[in-house]
Swiss-Prot record:
<protein>
    <recommendedName>
        <fullName>Alpha-amylase/subtilisin inhibitor</fullName>
    </recommendedName>
</protein>
<dbReference type="InterPro" id="IPR011065">
    <property type="entry name" value="Kunitz_inhibitor_STI-like_sf"/>
</dbReference>
<dbReference type="GO" id="GO:0004867">
    <property type="term" value="F:serine-type endopeptidase inhibitor activity"/>
</dbReference>
<keyword id="KW-1015">Disulfide bond</keyword>
<comment type="function">
    <text>This protein inhibits independently subtilisin and alpha-amylase.</text>
</comment>
<feature type="signal peptide">
    <location>
        <begin position="1"/>
        <end position="22"/>
    </location>
</feature>
<feature type="region of interest" description="Disordered">
    <location>
        <begin position="1"/>
        <end position="34"/>
    </location>
</feature>
<dbReference type="InterPro" id="IPR002160">
    <property type="entry name" value="Prot_inh_Kunz-lg"/>
</dbReference>
<keyword id="KW-0022">Alpha-amylase inhibitor</keyword>
<feature type="compositionally biased region" description="Pro residues">
    <location>
        <begin position="15"/>
        <end position="26"/>
    </location>
</feature>
<keyword id="KW-0722">Serine protease inhibitor</keyword>
<feature type="compositionally biased region" description="Polar residues">
    <location>
        <begin position="1"/>
        <end position="12"/>
    </location>
</feature>
<dbReference type="Pfam" id="PF00197">
    <property type="entry name" value="Kunitz_legume"/>
</dbReference>
<comment type="similarity">
    <text>Belongs to the protease inhibitor I3 (leguminous Kunitz-type inhibitor) family.</text>
</comment>
<dbReference type="GO" id="GO:0015066">
    <property type="term" value="F:alpha-amylase inhibitor activity"/>
</dbReference>
<feature type="disulfide bond">
    <location>
        <begin position="166"/>
        <end position="170"/>
    </location>
</feature>
<keyword id="KW-0732">Signal</keyword>
């Protein structure tokens, strides 16, 4: 009886197909219709300039440092530019996308001499959780206090968005005034703050 050598069959061989890569989420766009990039700076402006200006930094609640993320009340002011980068290991794709974890930091110098990266505060100041800059005071086990997302503003046909803090869970970010009617702070509150992104000049 003749022997049969392995691999000599004329039958075609079939290999499992590699898993298909999920489609990337849609990109975020600036006011000129260009995709947001991790190597560029942007102003975060109110979609309705009658509701105030861009995001900036301000002291609050009796603290000089760290600085709180706040909104300039003057609709003609752009605030400070920010740099938005993917959370975790930087991918080769430099496009900032919807529903994807990002880190946000101001591209500005302060008298506090510390990081200007955003994070959600674990403490309640005036009964709310604020977005502040600087190092995280009491990090959670997950360490995701500095994780944020950009989501499309519901029903918007233009490039309008909302910001979310996405630590252990995601929360909409809105603007509210302090108890003394002073600064306008960014924090976990409703209604959420509707924003647009305007490209800033290179630093």
């Amino acid at each position: 009886m003749g022997s049969r050598r392995a691999g000599s069959s004329s039958s075609p061989l079939f290999w499992p197909a590699p898993p298909s890569r999920a489609a990337d989420p849609p990109p975020v766009h600036d006011t000129d219709g260009h995709e947001l990039r991790a190597d560029a700076n942007y102003y975060v402006l109110s979609a309705n300039r009658a509701h105030g200006g861009g995001l900036t930094m301000a002291p609050g609640h009796g603290r000089h440092c760290p600085l709180f993320v706040s909104q300039d009340p003057n609709g003609q002011h752009d605030g400070f530019p920010v740099r938005i980068t993917p959370y975790g290991v930087a991918p080769s794709d430099k496009i900032i996308r919807l529903s994807t974890d990002v880190r946000i930091s101001f591209r500005a110098y302060t008298t506090c001499l510390q990081s200007t990266e955003w994070h959600i505060d674990s403490e309640l100041a005036a009964g709310r959780r604020h977005v502040i800059t600087g190092p995280v005071k009491d990090p959670s086990p997950s360490g995701r206090e500095n994780a944020f997302r950009i989501e499309k503003y519901s029903g918007a046909e233009v490039h309008e968005y909302k910001l979310m803090s996405c630590g252990d869970w995601c929360q909409d970010l809105g603007v509210f005034r302090d108890l003394k009617g002073g600064a306008w702070f960014l924090g976990a509150t409703e209604p959420y703050h509707v924003v647009v992104f305007k490209k800033a000049p290179p630093a």
